[in-house]
Each structure stands twice: as C-alpha cells, then as structure tokens.
C-alpha cells in the first residue's frame, strides 16, 4: 500500500489541506499543536473510520458544519480513492463514505467501506495492520529503555499476545458459567426415567381397559338389535292404533253430520211446500201491462226527459244570437277609435324600444358621472394625506423626496449593508476564536517550559538559555495575540453599533407608517387610472345620453287614456263575436226545433196506445221489476232446495252404513293397546340392562382417555427433558472443547508458539538491519521472553551496555522487524514523533539510521514520519512543514 495524496477539509485544525506523498521517506515537521498528528489521524479515519476524539462531530473544525477527508493510494496494481464525510444537521450527525477503485465506485456507507478495505484491499485484520504500520510516540525508545518485564508487555501488546492471555482468563469465566448451566444434568436424567416408568404403567392400564371394552361390545350390539326390533314393532302398533283412532274419529264425525243432515232435510221440506203459491203470484204479475208494454213506457219516459233538455238548448241558442247582433253593432261604432289607438300605441312602443336599446349606455353614462365626482373627491383627500405622511416620514428617514421606488431602494441598501456587517462580525468572531485558541496553546507551552528546560512533547533538553528565549518568545506571542484580540473586539463593537443603527432605520422603513404611505401611493395611482377610464366613458356615451333624453320626452308626450278605454270596449265586442260561431248556432237552432217537433209527435202516438202512460215513472217501473225478480229468485231457490233434499237423503244413508262399523274398530283398538303394553315392559327391561353396560363402558373409556392424555403430556415432558439433556450434553462437550482451547491459550500454548516464531523472525530481521548500520555489534538475539542480547567479539552483553546511538539503532531495527513480522508485505510505515524522549545526539543517530536503512531501500517503499525536530530533514526524500495561521493548519512543501 502506497499513499499518494490526502485532502482534508474542516478536519480538526485543517481548513483545506491537500497533501501529496511520494515513495521513500516523507517527513512532516512542525511546532507542537500545529496539526501534524491530524494528518496521521486523517489516514486512520479514511481507512477505518477511526477517531481519537470522544465524539464523532468533534472531528469537524470549530465553527464549521461539514468535514471531508479524501485518501488516494495504490495497492496491488489498483488505484483507490476513499472519501468520508461528517455533517451537522441540527442536533443530529450525518456520516457518509465511498470507495473508488480504478475510477469506479465499489461501495458506499461508513461500515461497508471499512469492511471492504479490511477484507478486499489489505487482506489482513484491521488491528494487525494498524499495529504493523503505525509506530506510536515513544514506542521505539520503550523497546530498549524499559526493563525486561515491561518490554515483554509492550511487545505482547504489539503482537496481540496480550489478547490471547486475556482470552485465557475469559475462557475460564465462560467454562465456569457453562459448568453451572449443566449442574442439573443428573437430576434431569432421573426425572426422564421417572416419566418413562409412569408412561409404562399407564400403557398397562390402557391395555386392560381396551380388552374389557372389546369384550363388552358384542353384548351391547345384541341388546341394541333386540331393542331396535321391539321399537320397530312398537312403531307399527302405534301406526295401527293411530289408524284405528282416526277411523273412530271419522265415525264420530259421521254421527254428528247425520244428525245435522236429518235436521236440514226437515227444514227444507217445510220451505218447499210454499212453491205452488209463489208460482201463481209470479204468473199474475207477468201479465200486468207494465211488464207487457214495458219498452214503450220506458221510451215515453226518456222522450219526456229529452223534451226538457231540447227546450233549454233552444233558449240558449236564442240568447247567443241576440248577443252576436248587439256586439256586431258596437264593433262598427268603435272602429275609428280602435285605429287611432293602434297608431299611437305603435309610436309609443317604437320610442320605448329606442329607450330600452339606449338604457345600458345611459346607465353607464350616469355611473361614470357619479364615479368621476366621487374619485375626484377621494383623490383630493388622499393627496392631502400623502403630503402629510411624506413630510412626517421624510423628517424621520432624512430623505428629501419620498416615493415607493426611493423607499424600496433605500430598504435594499440597508439590507445589503446589514449583510456585509453581519459577515464582517462573523469573520472577526472566527478570528478571535482562532487567536484565543492559539494564545491558549502558546500559554500552555510557556507554562510547561517554565522552570523545566525540557520540551513538553518529546522531552528534549533545551538548556536554560534556549528555554528562557522560547518562554520569552511565547510571552511576546501571547501579548501580541491579546492586543490583536482587543483590537478586533473594538472593531466588532463599532460594527455592532452600526448594525443597530441600520436595523433601527430598517425597522422604520418596514414600519406601518411607511407601508401605509406606499399603499396610499399605489392606491392613488390606481384611482387616477380609474378616473381616466370613467372620463373616457363619459365622453364616449354623451351622444347616447342625449338620444335617450329625447326619446323619453316624446314617449311621455303621447297620451292613450280615453283611446285605451275605447280600445278595451272594442276588444270585448270583438271577443264576443270571435267566441260565437254564428253559422253553427243558426244551423243548430233549426236542427233542435225539428227534433222538438218529432218528440212531441211520438209522445202523442204512445199516449193513444197506452192511455195511462202518464201514471208511470222510473220508480214505479223499478218497484215492479224488483217484485218480479224477487218472485223468480224464490221460485228458483225452492227448486234448488228440493234437488238438494234428495242429495241429503243419499248422504244420510251413507252415514248410517259407516256408523255400523264402529264396534269392530273398537275391538281392534283394545287388542293393539294390549300388545303395546307388553312391548313397553320388554323395552324397559332391555334398556335397563343396556344403561348399566353403557355406564361401565363410559367409565372405562373416560379412564382410557385420561390415561392417553396423561401419556401425551408425559411424552411432551420426556421430549422436552431429552432436548434439555441434549443441550446439556452439547454444553458438556463444549466445556471439554473449551478446556482444550483454553489450554492452548495458556502461556505454554499458542502464545509460546507465537513468541518462538516472533523471536526467530525478529532476531533474523534485526540482525540484517544491524549489519547495515556498521555498528560495533557482531550479532543480536531476541529470546521468547523478548530479552535482548547483543554480542561483541563473541561476548554476550545486555542492552544497557550499548551507547545511546547503538540503543537507538537496535530499537529502530526491532520495530521495523516487528512490523514485517505482523505484515510480511508491509509497504508503508507511519512513525509518530519517533524522536520523543531522544537527546540531540540520538536524534542525529536516528536520522543516519533512517537514511542508511530505509532510504532508497526495497524493504519498505514508503515511510511517513511526524516530528517537531528538524534534524530528521536530512534523511527525507520529501519534507512538509505544518504551521498554524489564524487558527488553521497550513501545509507547505519545504523539500
């Protein structure tokens, strides 16, 4: 993996830093707090979303809402770009990420990108990668300066052996928890056997009950069949008894109907004896003249009615003829008045049409006249009010001329001025924050240096004079910053006063008085346009107005008073004539007179034939008809009763024959009842026996069901216990496996293997690097407990026997060897403050070691170092310097 470029926007102290790296030694130097380590933090953040801050949003530069990091690197022939962002959105935080390979997006999302980097790009565990390529501050010195126990602890942490030992302790807790979980294993086995024994006992009882139930089934079946036979016979006897009872009921009915029929026959015989007298009276009435000459009498009555109706019609026709003659004379007398009326009415209607056609224009004209007068008055009043308000507002705003355009222009100027002031204040506040932050860093550094003479970051001895110069420099820098802060705060106060003044002016311009004035101007302009429209309408409609006035004058001069009354009389006379069809009336008058004469002639003929015809009327004829019909109906009724009496006699004979069978039916009924009594006794005995057997069967079946249900529950319990036992057995097996795994995690297990492998590899790699350094050391050995032994002239010596430079060389070789052990293909090494706690000579030695061992070497293609000491610049291929300017970190290429 080779890092080519990293871009930081609003990341920690970096506003916008775009940093390019190269192969070889990349040195990043700068004062404490300049933002050097932020670059390393950004690399870790881009790769794995790692952060050193407590909260994610704390990585966003103070005063900003958005942060972005872009990392460009090469790995295994591919070019990659990772982009991560954090954004404040109100109270929430939004994060995003994406990874691009050879120009194509591979995946998005913070966790997905991290997983892809670990599994598809680096192909090693994140922790192993970070441990192998990132050398922490003071880590190299600790490898040779600490005592053996502490050195072993440091190496265990680097190689993750400490995690195996922690796993060894954790596995004991897990095993103890699992052992407690299987403490009831024997109890469950005993409980299982108890349940199985209970099921076996239940099964024995079930077999006995099933045997009893099988034996009792044939007896129940035989009893049920015998009962069914008896029940069927009982049903047949009941049917026969029902039939006999029905026959007896029918005979009882016949006995009652016989008495009734005999009574009816006697009653009819008493009525039939009246038949001869009724026939004689009917014959006498049928020979009466009112019956024999009935049609002529009815004709005479109808002609008499028609005679009266014709007389009324003829009188009406005479009246219509008289009305017609009188109306005709009146029409001739009024004709001249009628003609004069129509002529004047036509003239008046024409004038009215003209007036109606001009009505809309006349109404519009009158409306325009009224509106002109009203608007002129309104404009006059509004101009006075605008003049008054303009004088008042002009005095307040200090503007000579007041118009809506001038007011809006002034408002825009004030808003623009306010925005500029707000921007300046925000910028100055940000500058104050940056200066205060810088001042705090300077004061902290001065406080840490004062009286100690040691660099607070790396522990370098500065000497009294250099320390005092640096403290003095920090004091001067703090004073200058305080002075700049005060000046900036005064500038902010002036800007704030101006802002208040401009806001006051804006409030006045946005006030109700100004708004009313603008509204009045706009309304006045609208009213003036409206006035012009109405004045144009008045001029356009003037001619129509004059025509309308002339038409109204002529219309009012025409008087139809007397002529209208004469015309009404003419219309009434004409209506009478129009309503009378004179020719039809004259024709009908002649026709009705002829009909009248014909009726009188026919009535005279009937009176000659029937002298007493006048004595008859409709009521007398009706009475005769009613009497005649009554006699005829009685005659027919008596003949019908005589025929019915013969039928009744036949029915009486039939009833007597059926009643004679009653004795035989009653004997059969008694015999059937006796048989039913015997069958009921038999059924009672059989049912009693069956009920007793059924009770036994029900009790056995109930017990059988209870035992089956009990077995079902027991089987469920057995299955549950077996499952629990299987789980327990799995756990017991797991405990045994975990014990074996824990044994592997013990100090004599995997950790010992790793230490052995690591010690061999680290010894070989360290030996190779030591040989390059051309030191007075023949060999070096690192044992499994990470004790370091060096050899001079074949004599073994401890690490403490080495000079400062030699110790630094061994420490550097060890750390590079460890990195290569963790990651065989390590192509990048990032060292954060490797000079920490080193004196000037040892820093110089480290520079030489780096130059001889890493520069232009194919072992580790790229090294990135962070330091605030410039002694290492000589060993670099690319040098970058980080400085703080106005609270932001700036990165410059210096070599």
Curated annotation (Swiss-Prot):
Keyword set, alphabetical order: ATP-binding, Coiled coil, DNA damage, DNA repair, Hydrolase, Metal-binding, Nucleotide-binding, Zinc
GO biological process, alphabetically ordered: double-strand break repair
Cofactor: Zn(2+)
Stretches of the chain forming a coiled coil according to its record: 183-253, 464-510, 618-647
InterPro entries cross-referenced by the UniProt entry: P-loop_NTPase (IPR027417), Rad50_ATPase_archaeal (IPR022982), RecF/RecN/SMC_N (IPR003395), Zn_hook_RAD50 (IPR013134)
Gene3D superfamilies: Helix hairpin bin, P-loop containing nucleotide triphosphate hydrolases
Binding positions for ATP per the UniProt entry: 32-38, 137
The Zinc-hook domain, residue ranges: 411-507
Binding site for Zn(2+): 455, 458
A Gene Ontology molecular function term of the record: ATP hydrolysis activity
Pfam families in UniProt: Rad50_zn_hook, SMC_N
Cofactor mode of binding and number, as noted: Binds 1 zinc ion per homodimer.
Keyword Methyltransferase assigned: no
Task performed by this protein: Part of the Rad50/Mre11 complex, which is involved in the early steps of DNA double-strand break (DSB) repair. The complex may facilitate opening of the processed DNA ends to aid in the recruitment of HerA and NurA. Rad50 controls the balance between DNA end bridging and DNA resection via ATP-dependent structural rearrangements of the Rad50/Mre11 complex.
Family designation: Belongs to the SMC family. RAD50 subfamily.
Subunit structure, interactors included: Homodimer. Forms a heterotetramer composed of two Mre11 subunits and two Rad50 subunits.
Recorded domain comment: The two conserved Cys that bind zinc constitute the zinc-hook, which separates the large intramolecular coiled coil regions. The 2 Cys residues coordinate one molecule of zinc with the help of the 2 Cys residues of the zinc-hook of another Rad50 molecule, thereby forming a V-shaped homodimer.
HAMAP family: RAD50
Name of the protein this chain belongs to: DNA double-strand break repair Rad50 ATPase
Native organism: Thermoplasma volcanium (strain ATCC 51530 / DSM 4299 / JCM 9571 / NBRC 15438 / GSS1)
The gene coding this protein: rad50
